[in-house]
Amino acid sequence: MVKNQAQKRGVKRKQVKNIPSGVVHVKATFNNTIVTITDPAGNVISWASAGKVGYSGSRKSSAFAATVAAQDAAKAAMSSGLKEVEVGLKGTGAGRESAVRALISSGLIVSVIRDETPVPHNGCRPRKRRRV
């Protein structure tokens, strides 16, 4: 009557949740693209960034890196039963549109695409202009 280690300690196994719809948050900056997939309540199902999928330096800011990151996050979310998503885009980086295209091509049904880019109503004073 030998029990395995998880049963001895009373550790619960992680349950696979079945979440049919969710929200994809795409944050596209000039240096990186972060794709986070959540359930409607805001709990994170999966996430990926251009840096997480293996790109570094200036290659993180490319549209192709955003495509790979979106496919990686979508694949992980679809394993938990995700089928339909709403997309919220934030930022003005190169990976905005390519991340949405990657989500569609990976098999997710995109119902809504929202632009959630934060725009100040004349808030804080911006940094000095960069002279190259």
Curated annotation (Swiss-Prot):
Alphabetical UniProt keywords: Ribonucleoprotein, Ribosomal protein, RNA-binding, rRNA-binding
PROSITE patterns the record matches: RIBOSOMAL_S11 (PS00054)
InterPro entries with a match to the protein in the record: Ribosomal_uS11 (IPR001971), Ribosomal_uS11_bac-type (IPR019981), Ribosomal_uS11_CS (IPR018102), Ribosomal_uS11_sf (IPR036967)
GO-annotated molecular function: rRNA binding; structural constituent of ribosome
Listed GO biological process terms: translation
CC terms in the record's Gene Ontology section: ribonucleoprotein complex; ribosome
This protein's record includes keyword Nucleus: no
Statement: the UniProt record of this protein carries the keyword Coiled coil: no
Function as written in the Swiss-Prot or TrEMBL entry: Located on the platform of the 30S subunit, it bridges several disparate RNA helices of the 16S rRNA. Forms part of the Shine-Dalgarno cleft in the 70S ribosome.
Subunit structure: Part of the 30S ribosomal subunit. Interacts with proteins S7 and S18. Binds to IF-3.
NCBIfam families recorded: PRK05309.1 (NF003698), uS11_bact (TIGR03632)
Family indicated by similarity: Belongs to the universal ribosomal protein uS11 family.
Name this protein carries in UniProt: Small ribosomal subunit protein uS11
Organism this protein belongs to: Chlamydia trachomatis serovar L2 (strain ATCC VR-902B / DSM 19102 / 434/Bu)
Gene: rpsK
